[in-house]
Amino acid sequence: QTQGWGAIYLENHDQSRSFNKYFREKAAARDDLHLRFLQGSALATLLMGLRGTVFVYQGEELGSENGKFNSIEEYDDLNTKDQYRRALRAGYDEAQSLKFVNDRSRDNSRMPFPWTVEANGGFTSGMPWLKCNDDYAAICAKKQEQDKASLLHYYRNLIRIRKDEANRESLIYGEVREIQNALESVIAFERIAENGEKIQIWVNMSDETQQADIAEGA
């Protein structure tokens, strides 16, 4: 075996949301659903273009972002509370300490899954372990299920493309080779099947339109 086989993921239960990791310096997508779709589709294209077994974490396919916790009491994660206390002991004030844990807490990815616009995202009629994200009604699964142009359907389309017989030898099993002439803000690589067939993937991670110099015949 000349190549390994990995578990490919951007998010899991011990990580904050990928939107907030990879687009921290970009325009905030919280109130701009079109921008959130563009950012989410970029991450989805990157994820689905890599070699290995792809894992999509709950809420990732909806474009979930980090939550907004207003006090340390709203958190459940013990490590988050410990980090908060450590920040206070280091001399940071309460607002600064809360900002630190807001950015990195594991509870960001452990909030209830937003199924519907109903209370608690339709997850439970009882008291959930954590509150729902503030924007759950705007991105809930039911709403995206009904919108063929949603991020949820974009993920589904990418999965179909990846599994399609015409693409699977490249997109699932093919070699990954970096495209050298891409701009710094663009992640570009090609997937190469054993028979030489290639699929190029270009992902713009900036907040501006970029022009790609794609070689003839690529």
Which functions belong to the PLM regions below?
Residues Q1-A218:
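Active-site and adjacent substrate-binding regions of carbohydrate-active enzymes
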